[in-house]
Structure formats: C-alpha cells, structure tokens
C-alpha cells in the first residue's frame, strides 16, 4: 500500500508539471503574438470596459451589439485594425433606450434598441443577432469633407445632408431636409402679395359726385347761354356737337365739347385735368377712371356721358322705381306719383291727383316753402342748384382773351376761364348782391 501511494503522488506531480509547462508555453506564445497586435492580450482586454466576455472590441459601447465586428480579424496589423482611443462613441452619451453605433472614426449614431433582435439561445451558447450591420452595409458612407449643416424633419441638426440620409437609411426612418442650417428652421418670409388697389371712394360716393358734377355742368351751361353768344368766327363751329347724342343731352355734351380742346372726340388726361381739383374732391380721378371702359387713358363722348347716367344717382327715377316695386304692377289708390324729366330728376311742378294740391320742388324733390296751393301753381322749370359744390356759387365760363369785367353782348368765346357769381340767399336782401366774386367754387 505505501508503494501504491508513492506511485500515485509521483503521477500527480508529473501531470501538474506537464500542465504547468503547457500553460507557460501558451503564455509565451501569446506574448510573442501580442508583439504584433496587443489587442489579443487577454490581460489587456480584461481592463477595457467596453469589450465583452468574448474579448472582441465593440465600438458601440454596448454588449448587446458586440457581434457587429465578429468578422473583424484581430490578426490584422494595427494600422488596418481599429484604434480604441478614437472610438467616437466615447464622447457620445445616448438615452437609456438607445445605444451608440459608429460608422467610422468621425460618425456616431444613437440607435433605438427596438432595432435590435432579442437574443436566441442554442443550447447553452448565447447567439446575438442584430439587423444593424446588414443595414449599415447597404447605407452609403459619407465623405470626410465638411459640408453645410441641415435640419432634418425629425427636428435634429445634421452636419451634412449625407449624414441625414445615412441616419435615415440605418434606422429605417423616412427623413428629409427641412432647411439649410441648424434647427429650428426660421419661418420663410411670406411672398409679397400684390395689394389690390382699394378705391378711395365707395360706389355711393362716386354716384353722389357724378350727380354733383352734373349739376355743376348744368349751371355752367345755363350761365354760358346767358352771357355768351357764338359768332361766325368761333373755331368750334362746324365740328361734331356731342350734345345731340341721346345720352349726352344739354349740359353733358356741352361740357364735353368745352373740354375737348383738340376736337378729336376724346378727352385725355390733360383735358380732363381742367376739372381735377383733388384737394377738394379726391373722388374725381377714381370716378373718371371707372368710366374708362377701354382702359386707354381716354374718355370718348359715350364714356363721358354714360359716366353721369348712374341709375342710383337719379332721385326721381329712383322714386318711380320704388313705387313700381311696391305696387307690383297694380295701381296705388291715393298714392302720390312724382313727375320726372328726361334726365331722371323731379320736374319743378308736382301735383297730388287725389288731393288736388300742387307745389314747387327743386330737381331733387325738395318742396319749396310756401309754394303748396290748391290747384295749379306757376313754378320755374329751371331751379337753382342745391349748392352741393360749396357756398361759393355757380361757375361761368369766360373767354381768356377778355379782361376781368362784366361781359357784354359782343364778347367773344375762346378758351375756358372760370369765374363765379354769387348765389342769392333766400334770407338776404337783393341789395347785398351787387358785385361778383372771383375764385374757385370749391
């Protein structure tokens, strides 16, 4: 028995020496190999926290994806292998639900763990699979050259558009560039929309102005007929008389002829400017612009005269239209029916058929005080204007060649000249109006 015990002890000692010698040989061989690449040194690898138990360097700083570089050959020379000190993930801190993935020494991405497949076990060996490597192989790497930053549709700033496309490719997201430069994108300035020119005057104001101008022209025409007698030497004789047109009766056609200084039956800006007093009537220019149907900057005689035939500006005609709408084609018993002239204004004499009373009115239908009587009354057919153009009075056209004196029957007519005669007030004595006052009526 003692001999057997001695033999067993000797055999155990010999086995220990064999194992120990093999271990030393392995360490010696490993040290020699590590002279070529120190990454194969198990002792060095154990001190690096980012390497897993399989001792393969993982540049994603996460043990879950350490199989990304399973195909990396650690026996390559160091200049062709990976430099751990240049791992870009060392400077990146991802959120708890993401891990760091690098493409090269300058590109690091935080990838969601949802893109990682769960571990599958075969026996007692853990096999880890991840779709990232296959995706990254398909994605086009970005050049090292610097480029302009862009803001992605995910709200993150990328150093280049290529980096944005690479991130979209590697993560499977649909991303696009919102703007150049860092996020957030500044709102783009709205394109200047052409502002529609707003008319300075409403339609009602234009109609009222046309009505006042028509009254003014009527007063000018009336005064011209009183003080001016055409002579055989008048250069205006022999040309077309616009006043004979159906829509240019009396004062409208007469005023057109006076303004048409070159006798071309068109009023240009220089001719219309004779009545442009923008300081007092800012709606004059918009009125004539609205009457220029052909938009050629000129007014024909038809355009001129139609400009003053606004239905809404004819008081008596408007009243007749209102009565017709109320009656709906039936006769209104006991209703007052006004009498209108051809221009759409009230006639001077108005009578009520049911009561037999008559009275005098102006062209706008305003009854003259004390004129109402039973039976017929005598009213002047041409009433004074309403004074809408101001308190200065009505306007008389005079000859430029004449002196500033009272006109006689032998005076001549030439270019336009403007003077005023005072309007007699109802409450003033006739002795107070002896001399005319020169000036604009505005």
UniProtKB/Swiss-Prot annotation:
Protein location: Secreted, Extracellular space, Extracellular matrix
One annotated GO biological process = negative regulation of cell-substrate adhesion
Cystine connections: 89-100, 94-110, 139-169, 142-162, 151-183, 316-340, 351-358, 360-379
Residues in Kazal-like domain copies: 133-185
Show the Pfam families listed in the entry. Kazal_2, SPARC_Ca_bdg, Thyroglobulin_1
Glyco sites are at 386, 391
SUPFAM superfamilies associated with the record: EF-hand, Kazal-type serine protease inhibitors, Thyroglobulin type-1 domain
Q: Residue spans with biased composition (Acidic residues)? A: 425-442
Q: Which InterPro entries match?
A: EF-hand-dom_pair, Kazal_dom, Kazal_dom_sf, SPARC/Testican_Ca-bd-dom, Thyroglobulin_1, Thyroglobulin_1_sf
Tell me which positions the record assigns to the signal sequence.
1-21
PTM comment: the record says: Contains chondroitin sulfate and heparan sulfate O-linked oligosaccharides.
Report residue spans for region: Disordered: 375-395, 420-442
What positions does the domain Thyroglobulin type-1 occupy?
313-379
The record's Gene3D superfamilies line, in alphabetical order, gives: 3.30.60.30, EF-hand, Thyroglobulin type-1
Q: Which GO terms describe its molecular function?
A: calcium ion binding; cysteine-type endopeptidase inhibitor activity; metalloendopeptidase inhibitor activity
Tissues expressed in? Predominantly expressed in the postsynaptic area of pyramidal neurons.
User: Superkingdom, according to UniProt?
Assistant: Eukaryota
Q: Does the keyword Disulfide bond apply?
A: yes
Alphabetic keyword roster: Disulfide bond, Extracellular matrix, Glycoprotein, Heparan sulfate, Proteoglycan, Secreted, Signal
Naming one, the record's GO cellular component terms include:
postsynaptic density
Q: What does this protein do?
A: May play a role in cell-cell and cell-matrix interactions. May contribute to various neuronal mechanisms in the central nervous system.
Identify this protein by name: Testican-1
Its source organism is Mus musculus
